């Protein structure tokens, strides 16, 4: 067997009535990286993509996790550069790439861990360009109180059909509420 996936499944109708289930469909789940496409919606809605000329490839790295391969890192650097931002402004924690050949190359070259290599750096770049475009503070953009995070919370609640007060949050591995 190649892989095993565990989970809880619910099939619902358009009203949310459960038609079929397996496991516990009421179990709370931490969204983690599966929330990245939702976290990217405010980037799109803000007009930052058009304003900074963000490409489809760059949007893809904003919406996803990446392995830190050179083309991923270049995409994140490009996003930041287009908005006049620096990789030093990323608050996602310093990492080596998950892509082992890239990690090995950095170590051989004596290059330390850095936020740009974090698998979540694209998402963070999207948050930063949104704040920059809307004239908001770039400081503490990961805090729940920051307008960037409040917009993400509103999108998440809307997509789930609940009030923002009903969304139970925790801080994910890269420092943002999810």
Protein language model features and the residues they cover:
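Beta-lactamase-like hydrolase cores
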Residues: 1-26
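A short N-terminal beta->alpha junction/helix N-cap motif
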Residues: 3, 26-34, 64
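A common structural microfeature
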Residues: 6-8, 38, 58
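Proline/glycine-anchored alpha-helix kink/cap motifs
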Residues: 10, 41-43, 130-131
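Short, solvent-exposed loop/edge-beta patches enriched in aromatic
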Residues: 14, 45-49, 84
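Active-site SXXK
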Residues: 31-49
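Phosphate-handling active-site elements
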Residues: 48-56
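Active-site-adjacent helix/loop patches that line small-molecule binding or acyl-intermediate pockets
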Residues: 55-177
């Amino acid at each position: 067997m190649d892989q095993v996936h565990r989970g809880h499944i619910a099939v619902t109708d358009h009203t949310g009535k459960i038609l079929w289930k397996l496991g516990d469909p009421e179990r709370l789940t931490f969204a983690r990286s599966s929330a990245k496409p939702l976290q990217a919606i405010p980037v799109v809605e803000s007009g930052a993509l058009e304003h900074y000329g963000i490409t489809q490839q760059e949007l893809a790295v904003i919406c996803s996790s990446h392995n830190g391969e050179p083309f991923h890192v270049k995409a994140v650097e490009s996003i930041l550069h287009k908005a006049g931002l620096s990789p030093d402004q990323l608050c996602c924690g310093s990492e080596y790439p998950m892509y082992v050949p890239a990690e090995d190359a950095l170590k051989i070259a004596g290059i330390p861990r850095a936020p740009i290599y974090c698998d979540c750096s694209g998402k963070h770049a999207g948050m930063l360009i949104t704040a920059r475009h809307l004239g908001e503070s770039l400081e503490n953009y990961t805090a729940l109180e920051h307008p960037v995070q409040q917009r993400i919370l509103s999108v998440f609640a809307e997509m789930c059909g609940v009030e923002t007060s009903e969304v139970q949050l925790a801080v994910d591995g890269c420092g943002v509420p999810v």
